[in-house]
Design a protein with these regions (language model features):
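Short, contiguous acidic/charged loop-to-helix segments that flank catalytic cores in large enzymes
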Residues: 503-505, 551-564, 592-597, 623-628
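Mobile, glycine-rich extracellular loop/lid and propeptide segments
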Residues: 140-490, 508-539, 569-576, 585-594, ...
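Ser/Thr-rich, Pro/Gly/Ala-heavy low-complexity intrinsically disordered linkers and tails
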Residues: 7-139
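Intrinsic-disorder/low-complexity coil detector
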Residues: 16-17, 23, 33, 55, ...
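Sec-dependent N-terminal signal peptides
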Residues: 1-5
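Surface-exposed, extracytoplasmic segments of Gram-negative outer-membrane nutrient-acquisition systems
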Residues: 485-504
Length: 663
């Protein structure tokens, strides 16, 4: 269902929009009168711009036809071919395959240490400079993918407006908020100078747990959405998955998500084709479905052949196998990791819900044009678990096309030469119709941490652009620094074979959920991380190792409730004007005080001096007008072109910059 006119904006509100928390179905709001169409791609615009409370029926409100547009982008059972290519195997052990080239996301040639998104080298938001992109600006910054680039640096190095002095000024604060129909789990994406309806606009994109996608003018506080598409139709029995559907299958009472489970991952945008790729989950008259959608970012219309069902099976005797095959389960498999786009292939990683049921970790690759499935990798084909969730991070890709990811609780038979890779760093290479496992690292204590839910896979992988290093954290409170040319595989005695093990929490018990971020400044190279119940930590990179340089005086909140630690710590974004000394800022979203594990809690945005993180410059609790509401767990702020865009679980995202009103 596509709406080209919609709800009005919520100006500078510190409160939850009407119905956003209370409404059990979180329906889409819309002005205008969508006409019935195929795939949500056809809409007639009626009296647009009408303000609407969230519709408790889940359909269009204020005059929009409740059944307008075919639900889910086509036939209820998937429309286009279900995944296309044949299963691809469970992953093949191999030596390093032939180089497939370093074509980066967006078409730029690869740089040393990792291809940059759409031409942004060595981290930072994509600027698009390597190739003409039509309506997408080649000079302003954009954010097309989770944490800004394929290295997952979390850095926008084209920020010249927001400086430490500006953030400290009296005029910096919340400018406005924009309402959406549910919680926002995927990172907000941003495209500068996009041609929408013949007008150049900076556009911010939001996806919600009510299976909605929104496009907003990033600078207009009052405008309705440029377009809005929703993949549900309650009158036809098509809704998001609910947490109740998982109770008893994943934990006795499932609470990792609060109500609905729609779009849980960060989409990815190809600026050369103006296409967004995303996964939407639905329950259709009792049948659970996940679909890959390809949308035109200029109008929300489906691309030809979109959507396709996400389905896969590979040979294996692991848990849940039937006839010596394991299969992706559309209910049990949680597509939490952000999507990645590389070399014309869209990658989706799958974990679990609360380690429940007979699940396995999966990485599926789809051709970006045909949407046929071209590669399949299962992490534990002959075992169990090994989910790829990474607290929402997307797989990293280096300049040679190698893919890096981490896996969570599960079996790891690496000591005996098997292929199950739970609790591991995994390095993959696309070769023809297969994903080859070319290297891995499994910590010596994996079986102990497995039993205690202290898995490796709680962060993604950060590739350092300046060297052959990859870094990731764990629920054990440890950062692992690995050599990308030799990850270390497995040593039954210790972890001495890897570059470095860095305990970042006092008793190795506080989890790390935020993948570290990176900055190469005039004063040196730095990596930043903010674990649960810990200070923001700044490490200098020297000779390929991490040396603690500074710790903030502010901790991520400490929850003294018995048997609980404050989750998830700080989820970070870095901005700077290249490597200019004194230009760097660390932006962190954290809970204000409570633990965000299995509950929704209030959040705070904090800004630190990236040159010396002992200096907190500003936070959103200093003025009542700056609060954004409930924390979007695991979701970083998107900071670009002089503004910070903060997702929330309060049915809105909020925008910060210069020109805030004080009261």
């Amino acid at each position: 269902m596509l709406f080209l006119a919609g709800v009005s904006s919520l100006m500078c509100s510190n409160q939850t929009p009407p119905g956003a928390s209370q409404d059990p179905t979180g329906g889409a709001a819309s002005g205008g009168s969508p006409a019935a169409g195929n795939g949500g791609s056809t809409a007639a615009v009626g009296a647009g711009g009408a303000t609407s409370a969230l519709n408790p029926e889940g359909g269009a409100a204020n005059g929009g036809a409740a059944n307008g547009g075919a639900a889910n982008g086509g036939a209820a059972n998937g429309g286009a071919a279900n995944g296309g290519a044949a299963d691809g195997g469970a992953g093949i052990e191999a030596g390093a395959p032939a180089d497939l080239g370093g074509t980066s996301f967006g078409g730029a040639s690869s740089a040393a240490g990792g291809a940059a998104s759409a031409g942004a080298a060595n981290g930072g938001a994509a600027s698009g400079g390597a190739a003409p992109m039509g309506g997408v600006s080649a000079t302003s910054a954009s954010v097309f993918t989770r944490s800004n680039d394929l290295q997952r640096s979390g850095s926008n190095l084209k920020e010249s407006v927001l400086t430490p002095a500006v953030v400290r000024s009296a005029g910096f604060g919340k400018l406005f908020c924009k309402p959406v129909d549910d919680e926002i789990y995927g990172q907000l994406l941003y495209v500068s100078a996009l041609d929408v309806g013949g007008q150049k606009r900076d556009v911010v994109f939001a996806v919600t747990m009510n299976d909605s996608v929104y496009a907003f003018d990033a600078n207009d506080a009052e405008a309705a959405p440029l377009w809005h598409v929703n993949y549900t139709d309650p009158k036809k029995g098509i809704t998001p998955v609910s947490t109740g559907d998982l109770s008893g299958l994943a934990c006795s009472q499932y609470r990792d998500f609060s109500r609905q489970i729609g779009i849980t991952s960060t989409p990815v945008i190809d600026p050369n084709t103006f296409t967004m790729y995303l996964n939407a989950r639905t329950k259709e008259n009792g049948v659970f479905v996940q679909r890959l959608h390809a949308l035109d970012i200029r109008n929300g219309e489906e691309r030809p052949g979109s959507p396709v069902k996400l389905e896969a099976s590979v040979p294996g005797t692991g848990t849940g196998s039937v006839d010596a095959k394991i299969s992706l389960d559309p209910l049990l498999n949680n597509q939490r990791a952000g999507l990645a786009l590389h070399d014309n292939t869209v990658y989706l990683g799958f974990g679990s819900h609360c380690d429940g049921g007979s699940y396995h970790g999966w990485l599926l690759g789809y051709d970006a044009r045909s949407l046929s499935r071209v590669v399949t990798y299962a992490t534990t084909p002959n075992g169990w678990g090994g989910g790829i969730w990474m607290s929402g991070m997307a797989p990293a890709v280096d300049g040679e096309g190698f893919i890096y990811l981490t896996t969570a609780n599960g079996s790891a038979d690496v000591a005996s030469g098997g292929g199950d890779r739970g609790q591991s760093f995994v390095k993959l290479k696309r070769q023809a119709q297969a994903l080859l496992v070319v290297d891995w690292f499994t910590p010596v204590d994996w079986s102990v941490t497995n039993l205690e839910d202290r898995d490796v896979g709680s962060t993604g992988a950060l590739l350092l652009p300046s060297s052959n290093r990859v870094i990731g954290g764990s629920k054990e409170g440890v950062l692992y620094v690995l050599d990308t040319n030799d990850l270390g595989k497995f040593n039954e005695n210790d972890n001495a074979q890897i570059v470095q093990t860095v305990p970042v929490t006092g008793e190795r018990r506080s989890h790390i959920h935020g993948t570290p971020v990176y900055w190469k400044s005039a004063g040196g190279e730095y990596v930043y991380v903010m674990p649960e119940e810990e200070h923001l930590q700044q490490y200098q990179v020297k000779e390929g190792k991490l040396i603690l340089a500074h710790e903030s005086e502010v901790t991520s909140p400490v929850d003294h409730h018995a048997a609980s630690t404050t989750m998830p710590g700080g989820i970070l974004t870095l901005t700077a004007n290249g490597g200019v000394a004194g230009s760097g800022l660390i932006w962190a979203t954290t809970p204000i005080a409570q633990d965000a594990n299995q509950q929704v809690v209030s959040g705070v945005l904090r800004v630190f001096d990236a040159n010396d993180v002992t200096r907190e410059l500003w936070n959103s609790e200093q003025s009542a007008n700056d609060s954004f509401g409930n924390l979007a767990k695991f979701n970083p702020p998107t900071v670009v072109n002089g503004r910070a865009y903060v997702p929330t679980f309060s049915g809105q995202f909020c925008v910060y910059g210069v020109g805030a009103t004080r009261r």
